[in-house]
Amino acid sequence: LALVLDSMRYWVTEMGIDGFRFDLATTLIRDSHHHVDQNHPFKRVIADDPAFDDIKMIAEPWDMGPFGYQVGRFGRGWSEWNDRYRGFMRDYWRGTVGVQELATRLSGSADLFDGSDRPPSASINFITAHDGFTMRDLVSYNHKHNKANGEHNRDGSDDNRSWNCGVEGETDDEGINALRHRQARNLIATLLLPRGGPMITA
């Protein structure tokens, strides 16, 4: 814990960075019995240390352990990846869900983040991330095709909620390519319009 916090202070005070994103952040707040502790010393030190005033703290609020899914529970001072937003928007633009949840997601996902009087910026909205399907994959494939890496297509999630627009993979069909471009624009628009912080991956 001390090494992590000392490293963070160095990056803030010496390098001038303005925020951190914690991969599998729930791992950092487990106690010695591997239980999730939302009042963990790691979070308390960050909240109390003036070096971290006005520094953005962004959690990927889950890990692989028991009760690791902690979306909406990191509390004030933290923003969190909103995978409910990601999943819903992917489903919405595939036409598999209705509009009832759309207003909730576009208005900052208050069902997840309002419990501890958190602002809409607590929701980090995203469609794609550094792992899984890219935006182009989302509109080009119904299934993953990770066959060239020696893992026999076992790696990566099978729950991609994608739509190939009529043809699996690359195509020269102008109509399908036009539809794919429109679908990508739809996804990007719903990433830029809602309350909360957008996360855009290249």
Describe the role of every protein-language-model region.
Residues L5-D31:
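Active-site groove signature of glycoside hydrolases
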Residues L1-L3:
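Active-site mouth loops of central-metabolism enzymes
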Residues G16, S32, D37-A202:
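Conserved alpha/beta catalytic core and glycan-binding cleft of carbohydrate-active enzymes
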